[in-house]
């Protein structure tokens, strides 16, 4: 099965300051939704969190996700990506969160780091892509 492609006309959502709403599953099956900063490597949607947060725990147990990304300039234009985490790594996660801080906050360093916090990157391989607008 081939990986669904993000339509070219929606790739700008990954360069704008668009937040994704990330849905993961709790151990009892309830959905848990969190806004996250997003990135795209041409094949996978990427987000970053701290080890031990609820989304990290959920994704270590169940790799399925859904992301909804609305255009900040036109909320009726959006992208939905359903898929699975294909990679979880701490390698490069500090540099990546700083890159995201530059994009979203215009700060060179992520300003909300907590003492002892370990950052982790998740890469999501799309299995279903829907768009509108």
Q: What is the predicted role of each segment?
A:
Residues 1-20:
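Extreme N-terminal tail/first-helix region
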């Amino acid at each position: 099965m081939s990986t669904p492609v993000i339509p070219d006309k929606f790739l700008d959502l990954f360069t704008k300051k668009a937040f994704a709403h990330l849905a993961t599953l709790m151990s009892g099956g309830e959905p848990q939704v969190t806004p996250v900063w997003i990135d795209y490597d041409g094949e996978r949607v990427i987000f970053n969190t701290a080890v031990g947060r609820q989304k990290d725990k959920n994704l270590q147990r169940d790799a399925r996700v859904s992301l909804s990304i609305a255009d900040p300039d036109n909320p009726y234009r959006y992208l939905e990506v359903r898929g699975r985490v294909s990679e979880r790594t701490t390698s490069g996660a500090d540099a990546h969160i700083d890159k995201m801080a530059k994009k979203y906050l215009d700060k060179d360093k992520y300003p909300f780091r907590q003492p002892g916090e370990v950052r982790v990157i998740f890469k999501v391989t799309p299995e279903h892509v829907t768009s509108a607008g």
